[in-house]
Amino acid sequence: MANITNEFMGHDMLAPFTAGWQSDMEPLVIEKSEGSYVYDINGKKYLDTLSGLWCTTLGGSETRLVEAANKQLNTLPFYHSFWNRTTKPSLDLAKELLNMFTANKMAKVFFTNSGSEANDTQVKLVWYYNNALGRPQKKKIIARAKAYHGSTYISAGLSGLPPMHQKFDLPPPFVLHTECPHYWAYHLPGETEEEFSTRLANNLESLILNEGPETVAAFIAEPVLGAAGVILPPATYFDKVQAILRKHDILFIADEVVCGFGRLGTMFGSDKYNIKPDLVSVAKALSSGYMPIAAVLVSQKISSVILSESNKIGAFCHGFTYSGHPVACAVALEALKIYKERNITEVVNKISQKFQEGLKAFADSPIIGEIRGTGLALSTEFVNNKSPNDPFPYEWAVGTYFGAQCAKYGMLVSSTGDHVNMAPPFTLSLEELDELIRIYGKALKDTEKRVEELKSQKK
């Protein structure tokens, strides 16, 4: 048995989203995956309720994806897609994605390696498009507070999370942020969901008018805000937002990185909320996380301008060495085949009711303000006195403590501040779901006790 403390403490990695003090702690080193479970280097088994990072939808041991990678590695391990050269897996995957996305007619696919790169690409596409139309001033992008769109320069700027901006000179001046559509947290007394949506839509239009519609190029949104805590759009929100965007000739970018490929019980979040985007970003579940790959879906409206005008203003000079990597594309293509064959949205809908109802049964806990979710995505918000305006003291780290208790009992969740996210793989069995609910309950009981102790110490 390996000794984590001796072997890995003070390790050589500069880890993502990790503070310096954490480098002196024992890291959790994951060594093996099997179905809905992962195992650490000491052999401890954990139910992985975040699908890695929202991505391993088909679980950790789907042999068909491994075989697809192996077959492609033995045929053509790499070739690029520059200068009108490409590979068959990339062409086949592009065609399949265009057929699969039906919320609006898409015409072209551009491959990247991550959701961050996809959203960076979206902004460059929008800028190129407006330059091609002779509108160089139409460049600003509107995103939303609390949104997560990635961590590269542009995508981190689009993200509405202050810790991602601090010390990085972000957001850039061309990025604007409008309000987060979290009804529970931000509605006024007596305000209905539809009235809340109307107020936010009116504020969005005021922002556009104040900036000048001729300067605003696009609006980017996740159908459901994932990392922010599975924040669902309030009633009529996207209908009202899209009407404003059309009125002012502003493009809609749908960030489907988390929501896409069945997570919400529909193939895409755009299907669930009647979104008709001009551009779409997909990643994560595209390959079930087995290979790094993402894609940008481009509507006919935009692609026709780019293709026709590039002969006049110059080529769309953007791309990555690994854009359309043949192995990643082969794995993604097999994942999409599995989603179709297994009718994955039906699978999600069959287990999501018990998942949602089983966990929302804990909503009466005195330390929980809201449990919200849809499909196989759910978030628990810990607050004092069940009020969004009364958070626990930061140093109490209530969400972090809950996550640590879950890990102690053999379950991994994502704890960000005092909200805890769960997005389990679609392979989750009913027995595993029972285990998930049981561990959640045990960890919650421990956390309630911990909060009571902290409150008594404060008196």
From Swiss-Prot:
Changing N384D: In strain: cv. Himo and cv. Takanotsume; altered activity leading to reduced pungency of sweeter fruits producing preferentially capsinoids over capsaicinoids. It holds the Pfam family Aminotran_3. Confined to the placenta of green fruits at high levels. Barely detectable in the pericarp and seeds as well as in the placenta of mature fruits. CDD domains: OAT_like (cd00610). One of its GO terms (biological process) is gamma-aminobutyric acid metabolic process. Pathway: Aromatic compound metabolism; phenylpropanoid biosynthesis. This is Vanillin aminotransferase. It comes from Capsicum annuum. The gene is VAMT.
